[in-house]
Amino acid sequence: MTMFNKIVKEFQWGQHKVRLETGEIARQASGAVIVDVEDTVVLATVVGARTAKPGQDFFPLTVDYLEKTYAAGKIPGGFFRREGRPSEGETLISRLIDRPLRPLFPEGFYNEVQVVIHVLSLNPEIPADIPALIGASAALAVSGLPFNGPVGAARVAYINNEYVLNPTRPQMKESALDLIVAGTERAVLMVESEAQQLSEEVMLGGVVFGHEQMQIAIDAIHDLVREGGKPEWDWQPAAKNEPLIARVTELAQADLLAAYQLRDKQARSAKLKEIYAATSAKLEEDAAAGGTVAADKATVGNVLFDIEAKIVRTQILNGEPRIDGRDTRTVRPIEIRTGVLPRTHGSALFTRGETQALVVATLGTKGDEQNIDALEGEYRERFMLHYNMPPFATGETGRVGSPKRREIGHGRLAKRALAACLPSADEFGYSIRVVSEITESNGSSSMASVCGGCLALMDAGVPMKAHVAGIAMGLILEGNKFAVLTDILGDEDHLGDMDFKVAGTEQGVTALQMDIKIQGITREIMQVALAQAKEGRLHILGKMTSAVSGANTVLSDYAPRMITIKINPEKIRDVIGKGGSVIRALTEETGTTIDISDDGVVTIASTSSEGMAEAKKRIENITLEVEVGQVYEGTVLKLLDFGAIVNILPGKDGLLHISEIANERIKDINDYLKDGQQVKVKVIQTDEKGRVRLSAKALLNDAANGAPQGEPTPQQ
């Protein structure tokens, strides 16, 4: 007899066997599920508060994805030898899980919900993000919380013109597409992808393929809930306060309509604040006059927001101008300036309407690459992109400091968009960091970062394969009527049913991100939306190409120059020296940065061409191979009874036997040589142990016979 009511469901999913378990671990959580995909094991837990906090006016959902180093058989680094703050990868996966779950909680549900996913075991070939998303969905489904799921998820690759479900890491290296799609049985809710300039048709096909394949996982979660699910919560949304809605509509609708005729964001925002304050004040007067308690500001704010949404959505669906006066297909005015900052390696100021990004590109050496100690193994990242949005960008005050989750997510999206068009390390040996400083924001700042990032890279002299532009799109759906909005504003993002961002070149898409709030978006609607996004992207690409036709052919004076030479890998230790003494002296004395790879490729970088040339010369001298028959200018290091030790190259000495000094017999070597004397010698023999025999006599004989002696190689 066991104390556990353990429920297990197993299913074959593509090339992987998946196991779902509940009822044994974390039984005090509202819901807990273990997902095992070929030895990648995650524990997903959900805890929901039974009541909402008083005055709560938003849904407080938090998702934390945590990787434990023991999962990969490792001990954490650092002084304390324990996991610290979440890595960038953990933050991104937390966001990935949050995005499809959040829209499935019912409107008005304000109870605090926390989803925590622990990675307990990791097969390096099976990424943990999809198991984590499936686990979070299953844990919510078995918890009984009001949740309109379950959600399924799948990763889709595109290899040899075929879609592949949940590929392994080795397969991903061959794929032209890395696409994650999540959704319910009926609809896609979230897409996150990176692609090698693929067509819109291929991208949409990947979304549809992933949605079809995730149904297997959704069915398994339903089976798990039937046997191991907890009773559903008896939660009902609060009844709508119809008298309050009618009164707020009467007080504010006309003013809100007028406010949305103001095309300037700051003026419109100021007017809306006035309306909110005036409406609340009037309701308080009504309550005081009637001897009742006025509705709290949060409730009034929600009613006003619903009225705003209805006004904006109705206007757009009726074909009226959008908030800023544009039609649905027009991109805001664009201004481009490059070379903005005098001392940076590359810079661009990209302005689209009231959204502006100041983007800076910096070139570095191999030593500047980011070393990432991920759970699946260490690797180096050559290209970095960081996105910052300070509060002044929206005319507000706020905290300034370490990047928030949103900034990390936007930076990763922009990085994915540009990565496909970067030159390879063989073509362009620099490490690259792009920083996007958002100086104004009214929608689509991540896509402004893509455009500005491409321009800054070209200004820095990075030979991009093509111009890359990004555009943010919106969609409004009411019944059978829908409208796709090109280049959305911040307000349109909040009031719409879908926002998606597409980045790419003239040839195709490099990144696609979708977030869908409702379940009525069909394949046909997505097809129309992607076609309209392409039209907008090509318009922006035309503006960018007119401003900057291609990458600068000359690097900034302040960017490091770089040369590479190849040495014998066995000579690497000679260049490094004992404890790094030789390479340290080289870098300090020549003012260069020197990187040596295991295959013997030496990269020398510096802003000084003279320093680079000096470092190259010294490394070549250190790594010169002793050749039989070659003549060297050596230095006598030590005199022996039977000859002398002569240094002919750095770190390479040879024996000049007494019989090889002169043609005549020598009684006392001191009559011919002295310590420190420069002597011209010829290599006559080397052996497998690296010992070198030298001769001065051979040169005398060569001279007597008229044989060419060659130029001596001087020692460093």
Curated annotation (Swiss-Prot):
Domain annotation S1 motif: ranges: 629-697
Name of the protein this chain belongs to: Polyribonucleotide nucleotidyltransferase
Essential cofactor(s): Mg(2+)
Entry-linked SUPFAM superfamilies: Eukaryotic type KH-domain (KH-domain type I) (SSF54791), Nucleic acid-binding proteins (SSF50249), Ribonuclease PH domain 2-like (SSF55666), Ribosomal protein S5 domain 2-like (SSF54211)
Keyword entries, A-Z: Cytoplasm, Magnesium, Metal-binding, Nucleotidyltransferase, RNA-binding, Transferase
Subcellular location: Cytoplasm
Organism the protein comes from: Paraburkholderia xenovorans (strain LB400)
InterPro entries: ExoRNase_PH_dom1 (IPR001247), ExoRNase_PH_dom2 (IPR015847), ExoRNase_PH_dom2_sf (IPR036345), KH_dom (IPR004087), KH_dom_type_1 (IPR004088), KH_dom_type_1_sf (IPR036612), NA-bd_OB-fold (IPR012340), PNPase (IPR012162)
Family to which the UniProt record says this protein belongs: Belongs to the polyribonucleotide nucleotidyltransferase family.
Classification via PROSITE patterns: KH_TYPE_1 (PS50084), S1 (PS50126)
Pfam family, one: S1
Its EC number(s): 2.7.7.8
Domain KH residue range list: 560-619
Enzyme class: transferase
SMART domains linked to this entry: KH, S1
Gene Ontology molecular function: 3'-5'-RNA exonuclease activity; magnesium ion binding; polyribonucleotide nucleotidyltransferase activity; RNA binding
Residue sites binding Mg(2+) per the record: 493, 499
One Gene Ontology biological process: mRNA catabolic process
Function: Involved in mRNA degradation. Catalyzes the phosphorolysis of single-stranded polyribonucleotides processively in the 3'- to 5'-direction.
Claim: Translocase is one of the keywords in the record: no
Domain of life per record: Bacteria
